[in-house]
Amino acid sequence: VPISSSESVWTSRIDEHWHDALQSLTRPLEVVDLFPRSILKGELPTPLLEELLALGTKVLKNPESNPDASLKLAGQLSQQRELRPNQPGVQPLIEDHLLPGCERWIRHVIDRQPPQGRGPWVQGRYHLKLIDLWLNCQIAGDYNPTHTHGGSFSGVIFLKTPPQITANSFDGQLCFHGPEEWHLQSFRTGMAHYVLPVPGEFYIFPAWQPHSVMPFRGDGERWSLAFNATAIPGPPRAQAMGNISLSNQRPMVQGF
């Protein structure tokens, strides 16, 4: 319906009034963002990134040397191979970056609550345990549909990307999905957040956070590591010595 001249003047005056009122406020207005979803971002030191790249090269040259993870993962990727805890770079990655990152996420979220509202997640009353870790090799046309994970935490570590994956398109990007659909007319614009894969950067997020990976076009491979971890109330229990499978007693597997 066309706006009449009188309605146009009235709307213009209201807009001017609101603008002037905002400029003359003696007490500032505050916008409160409700129900935040926290995602932790970090970066690996260069020597560790290089060690993991060398491990990825070795694994992909002889894929059968590591268990195939694709049968229990959601991704439609060229290769998905489980990594063992005794392989080069795996323990430093877990102990110095992934589990500390999960701990940082817990403290960021839980310490906002009053002490009586923190349940079992008080420091010293729980422990973190890695469930599994695997290598993803994505080529043109491969993708990962929207999915979640089992356990408490999941995450991705970017190792290598082809040059055509850039911020100019969504190709090859990781996407975090919100709980509602995107709808610009009603100001719902933050329901999908895309992350450009940068080698050495990693992201940790709650396992229930829906996410996906877009396909890309052209030559080259996109390498990443992914993991699942769980937070367990109670003090840590002593573990048997020797090599321990990161996949034993896996409660639920969905994939990255």
Segments and roles (model prediction):
Residues 228-256:
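Double-stranded beta-helix
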